[in-house]
Amino acid sequence: MAEEEPISVDYEVFGKVQGVFFRKYTQAEGNRLGLVGWVRNTDTGTVTGQLQGPSEKVREMQIWLQKKGSPKSRITKAQFQNERRIKKLEHSTFSICK
């Protein structure tokens, strides 16, 4: 059986997600799940990024972004868009962008 192609999805998380180590915890959770991508703060108080990896692991991370986050965060919603299958991963690590 051939290995499933990875997927890529963009995300934005709303609520109290800045100043609460959200990016650090997002990077750690992405690494734990074996995902690659990036995370950054926006000027509007949200956190955005991209996830890439096996669809099952990306789904786990999406739930984490919607419901858990960092210990002091308060997530009001998470939006996901531009989901697509990719031939190969476009990132080599899960990075925090400044």
From Swiss-Prot:
EC code(s) of this entry: 3.6.1.7
Signal sequence segment: none
One annotated GO molecular function: acylphosphatase activity
PANTHER family documented for this protein: ACYLPHOSPHATASE (PTHR10029), ACYLPHOSPHATASE-1 (PTHR10029:SF21)
InterPro entries given in the database record: Acylphosphatase, Acylphosphatase-like_dom, Acylphosphatase-like_dom_sf, Acylphosphatase_CS
Superkingdom per UniProt: Eukaryota
Name this polypeptide is given: Acylphosphatase-1
Stored PROSITE patterns: ACYLPHOSPHATASE_1, ACYLPHOSPHATASE_2, ACYLPHOSPHATASE_3
Organism phylogeny: Eukaryota, Metazoa, Chordata, Craniata, Vertebrata
The UniProt record lists the keyword Hydrolase: yes
Presence of the UniProt keyword Hydrolase in the record: yes
Domain Acylphosphatase-like: residue ranges: 8-98
Catalytic activity from the UniProt record: an acyl phosphate + H2O = a carboxylate + phosphate + H(+)
The organism of origin for this protein: Xenopus tropicalis
Family stated for the protein in its record: Belongs to the acylphosphatase family.
Keywords: Hydrolase
Annotated Pfam families: Acylphosphatase
Catalytic residues identified in the record: 23, 41
